[in-house]
Regions:
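Carbohydrate-associated surface elements
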Residues: 13, 156, 176-179
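Nucleotide-sugar-dependent
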Residues: 216, 257, 261-273, 278-299, ...
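N-terminal subdomain of nucleotide-sugar transferases
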Residues: 1-36
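Nucleotide-activated donor-binding/catalytic signature segment of Leloir-type glycosyltransferases, i.e.
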Residues: 201, 228-237, 242-269
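Membrane-proximal helix-turn-helix segments that form the acceptor-binding/catalytic region
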Residues: 73, 81, 93-96, 100-104, ...
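Acidic anion/phosphate-binding donor-loop and adjacent secondary structure
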Residues: 5, 162, 179-196, 217
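An aromatic- and histidine-rich active-site surface loop
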Residues: 57-73, 82-107, 111-114, 119
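Conserved donor-binding/catalytic core segment of Leloir-type glycosyltransferases
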Residues: 180, 200-216, 222-226, 234
Length: 321
């Protein structure tokens, strides 16, 4: 947009933090907002009541991707060709949505992969049905092969995808790591308003901030909290594993673990500054399917990172540098 290009974004209505459509955004299947540089179309994401119902989530992804595809045909007005289409995964279903848009509106298709599915779901045990996995793997390969460019976050992810494709597709794979706005996330004083809101004094805080899923191995945080009762451990975020972690904390009467909801993006710098040490855990074997990009935000905030991730992969290599 800064170069004068016209952009049309088709995305979801705000829902991720609460796993429900945020107040003031409900009541419509989509909303269109005109901007100085183009337009934003926000589509209903069809969220279920819980992230643990995988069949319901899959249905939501399919419905969302279908509506996104239809709205992408008219974003910016008809009949208009476009120069490029950018689709992002997850959800994986947006790969074919991008291809569908390209068929009708021309332009190159760039498929940006944040996590590799269905590998991530299969390796965490979230999906075990062989028929579902077979269908998802077909969708994955079909999406890669129909893209002009596939962008991945690390060499580890690139090698994973390359192993699934014929060599004639390998020149389409490119690595572009995630990044942060270092002017928005800056080092700050550790004694923040956020710390006071949590009811934590000047104790050392070990923090995990991000998605609280089953791939993060956050049981490590609870184990550390048991052995270091003088340190406060903060889990900031939400996800499918949060309830089970809270149940474990309550059952074991661990009183130095604090759970907090996602905070507004404007508070990210303050939240990260509240932590003295940040942990970035990932289950063994998952570094080839996912890159915890929260590391970049933590480093921008000037805080140390303790990573529990497969040795020799993207995050350990970056920290070693």
């Amino acid at each position: 947009a800064a170069l004068g290009h016209e952009l049309h974004v088709v995305t979801s209505l705000p829902w991720y933090r609460e796993h429900a459509i945020e107040s003031g955004w409900g009541g419509r299947l989509w909303r269109v907002e005109k901007t100085a540089w183009g337009s934003i179309t926000r589509v209903h994401p069809f969220p279920g009541k819980t992230k643990r119902n995988l069949l319901r989530r899959a249905l939501g992804f399919v419905l969302f991707s279908a509506v996104v595809g239809l709205r992408s045909l008219v974003a910016g007005g008809l009949p208009r060709r476009v120069d490029g289409v950018l689709a992002m995964s997850p959800p994986l279903t947006l790969g074919l949505t991008g291809w569908f848009t390209k068929l009708f509106r021309s332009g190159m298709l760039v498929f940006n992969i944040q996590d590799i599915f269905p590998d991530a779901a299969a390796q965490t045990g979230a999906i075990t049905n062989k028929q579902i996995l077979r269908a998802a793997r077909w969708l994955e390969r079909a999406s890669y092969e129909r893209s002009d460019t596939v962008v991945l976050l690390s060499e580890d992810l690139k090698q994973n995808v390359a192993a699934k494709l014929s060599t004639k597709f390998h020149d389409r794979l490119h690595v572009i790591p995630n990044f942060v706005d270092t002017s928005a996330i800056v080092p700050g004083d550790r004694m923040t308003s956020y710390r006071r809101e949590l009811g934590i004094d000047d104790r050392v805080i070990v923090m995990y901030a991000g998605n609280v899923g089953f791939s993060q191995s956050l049981e490590l945080v609870l184990a550390a909290a048991r052995s270091m009762p003088h340190i406060a451990f903060v889990i900031n975020g939400d996800g499918a594993a949060r309830k089970s972690l809270q149940d474990e904390v309550n059952a074991a009467d661990i009183d130095n673990v604090y759970f907090a909801d996602y905070q507004p993006i404007e508070r990210l710098s303050e939240v990260l500054s509240s932590g003295d040490i940040h942990v970035v855990p990932l289950k063994t074997g998952l570094a080839s399917v996912s890159v915890p990009s929260k590391m970049y935000s933590i480093l921008s905030a000037g805080r140390p990172v303790v990573a529990a991730i497969d040795a020799g992969t993207e995050i350990p290599r970056t920290l070693a540098e």
